[in-house]
Amino acid sequence: GEIEMLRSVIVFLVHIFSVIVFRVKLVGKENVPKEGAYIMCANHQSNWDAPILVSSTKRKMHVMAKEELFKNKFIYWLGDKCLVFPVKRGKMDLDSMKHSLKVLKDGEILMLFPEGTRKGMAKNGRAQNGAAFMALRTGVPVIPVNISGEMKPFHKVTIYYGKPLDFSEYKTSKPEKEVLEKVSKEIMDNIIMLEK
């Protein structure tokens, strides 16, 4: 429909912009599944991270973003067209949790930033457990992604895609805190290792 077409145009324009302005280079793209559900987890440096990752992925991707962004009317409009949905930070958000589980059950892609805040890794921020929870509830693979380089015009940005992480052995409807934290740490460790 019209929204799909508008979304495709927006994604295409962002892709052109990212290649020219941020000189984006993709490494390890062969690690990204061509079909089936998965969770993409990346480090978070700037508000350009999500648009650039979406435009670098051929498939439809649903993006979890902090609720505060949606106060901007343009971002709200854009997000609505580009499958971005809000999450309340620092507390259990059942609506975003249900939406995320539905996305994965429908065989689509969910993207989120496990640190929860920008520059989280630089400050050694502890990973939030949302990605681990989704992976353990659904058994879908997690693709770790590292965005390296500054998101400033004409600075080179490299996106490293890691091999899928399989946590299906821990799949359960009620993940325990210890397992959630173990899986969250493994996801973050894999994101960090990609830059080395």
Range-by-range predicted roles:
Residues L6, I10-F12, V19, V27, ...:
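Catalytic core of membrane glycerolipid acyltransferases/transacylases, capturing the structured
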Residues G1, M5-L6, D95-K196:
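Non-catalytic C-terminal accessory region of glycerolipid acyltransferases
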Residues V14, S18, C41, V54, ...:
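Conserved protein kinase catalytic domain
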